[in-house]
């Protein structure tokens, strides 16, 4: 017999017992009823106390009867307080048990779903699959590296030798340029006409010669 069956007397010849939800609802209704009874008794106690005070000096017999009724009401109130504590404890225990039952039910449902999901899975197959994936990734990386690597189509050159040859060519060109602008004495000048030039022509020629010399000086300074 289940725990709930033992609690509520289910599983016997009387038939199926109440569900936890039904029992919890009944306990809450009982708590509400007892709470109303508490309010009623507290009002009765206050009323009897008022009667006892009112008749304390005038009618002692009535005052004593009121105090006796007050004591009975107080006793009933104490009993209800104890009953409420017991019912509250029982309801909380039942609610916790019901919560645990729902949690376990959902966990079992999830476990079955996980088992179903893993039915067609085998750890060895998973390991093999992961190994295949790793190998394919490595192969893809090797292919990418091979494609991106410069290809000489059978011609392989030493980069250092090529750089040295390029530097030699650059030095030769530089030396050649320096020889061409080594100085004004190496630059052939135009022939001077033997016939006297007009004054204006002589001045223009002199100015042009000075400009040429200035240009040569700038080239020489740049070369150095």
Curated annotation (Swiss-Prot):
Major location category of this protein: cytoplasm
One Gene Ontology cellular component: multivesicular body
Keyword annotations from UniProtKB, A to Z: Coiled coil, Cytoplasm, Endosome, Membrane, Protein transport, Transport
Localization per record: Cytoplasm, Cytosol; Late endosome membrane
Biological process terms in GO annotation: cilium assembly; late endosome to vacuole transport via multivesicular body sorting pathway; midbody abscission; mitotic cytokinesis checkpoint signaling; negative regulation of cytokinesis; protein transport; vesicle budding from membrane
Comp. bias intervals (Gly residues): 7-17
Signal peptide: none
Disulphide bridges: none
UniProt-annotated stretches for the region Disordered: 1-21, 182-224
Topology in membrane: Peripheral membrane protein
Residues in coiled coil: 21-221
Regions crossing the membrane: none
InterPro entries attached to this UniProt entry: Snf7_fam
Biological function: Probable core component of the endosomal sorting required for transport complex III (ESCRT-III) which is involved in multivesicular bodies (MVBs) formation and sorting of endosomal cargo proteins into MVBs. MVBs contain intraluminal vesicles (ILVs) that are generated by invagination and scission from the limiting membrane of the endosome and mostly are delivered to lysosomes enabling degradation of membrane proteins, such as stimulated growth factor receptors, lysosomal enzymes and lipids.
Quaternary context: Probable core component of the endosomal sorting required for transport complex III (ESCRT-III). ESCRT-III components are thought to multimerize to form a flat lattice on the perimeter membrane of the endosome.
Family from the record: Belongs to the SNF7 family.
Protein name stated in the entry: Charged multivesicular body protein 4c
């Amino acid at each position: 017999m289940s725990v709930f069956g033992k609690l509520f007397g289910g599983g016997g010849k009387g038939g199926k017992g109440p569900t936890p939800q039904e029992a919890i609802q009944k306990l809450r209704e009982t708590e509400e009823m007892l709470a109303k009874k508490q309010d009623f008794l507290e009002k009765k106690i206050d009323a009897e106390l008022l009667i006892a005070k009112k008749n304390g000096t005038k009618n002692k017999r009535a005052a004593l009867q009121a105090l006796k009724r007050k004591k009975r009401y107080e006793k009933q109130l104490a009993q209800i307080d104890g009953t409420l504590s017991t019912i509250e404890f029982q309801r909380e225990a039942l609610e916790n048990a019901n919560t645990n039952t729902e949690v376990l039910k959902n966990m079992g449902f999830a476990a079955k779903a996980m088992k179903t999901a893993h039915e067609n899975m085998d750890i060895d197959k998973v390991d093999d699959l992961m190994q295949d994936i790793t190998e394919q990734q490595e192969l893809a990386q090797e292919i990418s590296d091979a494609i991106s690597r410069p290809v000489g189509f059978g011609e392989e050159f030493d980069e250092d030798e090529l750089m040295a040859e390029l530097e030699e060519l650059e030095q030769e060109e530089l030396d050649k340029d320096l020889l061409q602008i080594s100085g004004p004495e190496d630059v052939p000048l135009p022939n001077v006409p033997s016939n006297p030039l007009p004054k204006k022509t002589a001045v223009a020629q002199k100015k042009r010669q000075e400009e040429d010399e200035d240009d040569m000086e700038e080239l020489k300074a740049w070369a150095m």
